[in-house]
Amino acid sequence: MLTMDKEFDSKLTLQGNSSSNGETISRSKSFAFKAPQENFTYHDFELGKIYGVGSYSKVVRAKKKDNGTVYALKIMDKKFITKENKTAYVKLERIVLDQLEHPGIVKLFFTFQDTQSLYMALESCEGGELFDQITRKGRLSEDEARFYSAEVVDALEYIHNMGLIHRDIKPENLLLTLDGHIKIADFGSVKPMQDSQITVLPNAASDDKACTFVGTAAYVPPEVLNSSPATFGNDLWALGCTLYQMLSGTSPFKDASEWLIFQRIIARDIKFPNHFSEAARDLIDRLLDTDPSRRPGAGSEGYDSLKRHPFFKGVDWKNLRSQTPPKLAPDPASQSASPERDGSPWNPTHVGDTSVLQNDGHNGLSESSGSITRLASIDSFDSRWQQFLEPGESVLMISAVKKLQKITSKKVQLILTNKPRLIYVDPSKLVVKGNIIWSDNSNDLNVQVSSPSHFKICTPKKVLSFEDAKQRALQWKKAIETLQNR
């Protein structure tokens, strides 16, 4: 089992060697964490909706039972971390978050652990993800995009001045406070530079992970695909992709697979919509320069050159956080939820409501049930699944997915039929593990999409969370909703 007592304790001692007159001297330096390890268990919290799901972690809304304080609780699976050699990333994220102090970065309050999991209690951003605002509005106005990107620039300047590269800037990692200000989250891929002002573990700034692929495919710069060392320019490329997505509603290199996305990135195959202003087009074009040293913010002028760009004309950089943010588009699924039920565990009326694509998929509602097959992704359907169908029943959509629980996950085959039925099957034992009660009423059966890979199927009695590695979450939503409205 993973041992992280030292890294998650109240004090950390770093060992290092130095040389004096040819002799090697062992030195140590210790510092106290501002966010200490507490003697809590997850039973001390009322766990609510899932904010996000990663490869080895989940972030859930957690209310402390004794005082009512709400946190975003990051729950990390020790076994998976050890198996996948992610220990260094977890340690580094904890150490870095403890030392960062900026209004545009999520705050770490405390940590705790048990035999199975590590827990980090983070600031809860009740406004959801910037990704949500883009999808609910279709795309953002230029004024909205200018405000949000300016706050990202402000936080990135601080991060880079501290000698850190975030390496996973994207709309899903840009969280919003209840009043609408941006906070950068998820430092699980952070990379400290040699001159970092952050106290880190020995060798954290010099190991070979600087050239390792991390981040998200659609936002990865070409130099990373060519195995070049990480630079601050990596984050500036991702900023350009994010600004493009704010203004257009989609990422600039979107394609059907990661391989195709990478080919478009390497070829710099980018098309600007006609509604982009000249200033917006120019800034994005410069941020997406194939030479990372030429991106605004990465050159000798630093962030001054980025802040002076015409796109940011009128931005009051000194008083940015005191400005009035754009109005947040509410989640339609949460409007009918009564206030007193807010935060109740697994409340299907608003579970996961910080990341729902309610505006997507509506174009398919008028299609007949016979045309649903155009939406469906048939994932290696063969005779193994035929045995689970009733006479005359046919498959409309099927995928190998992970069924996610609070801590663990299990591979299942999710099947939607024309009856209609929704079932999930254990692919190894070939037995039905669950039958999701069908209803044409969206109040009794609805799908909530939190990312291209993650979605929830909600019924009055339970909420089932799934991960589709082939990023067909939205297709599942469309297929089910089209069948409901046939």
UniProtKB/Swiss-Prot annotation:
Q: What is its EC number?
A: 2.7.11.1
Catalysed conversion reaction? L-seryl-[protein] + ATP = O-phospho-L-seryl-[protein] + ADP + H(+); L-threonyl-[protein] + ATP = O-phospho-L-threonyl-[protein] + ADP + H(+)
Pfam families of this UniProt entry? Answer: PH_3, Pkinase
The record's keywords, sorted A to Z, are: ATP-binding, Cytoplasm, Kinase, Membrane, Nucleotide-binding, Phosphoprotein, Serine/threonine-protein kinase, Transferase
GO CC terms on record? cytoplasm; membrane
- Region feature (PIF-pocket): 76-120
Quaternary context? Interacts with the C-terminal PIF domain of OXI1/AGC2-1.
Q: What is the designated name of this protein?
A: 3-phosphoinositide-dependent protein kinase 2
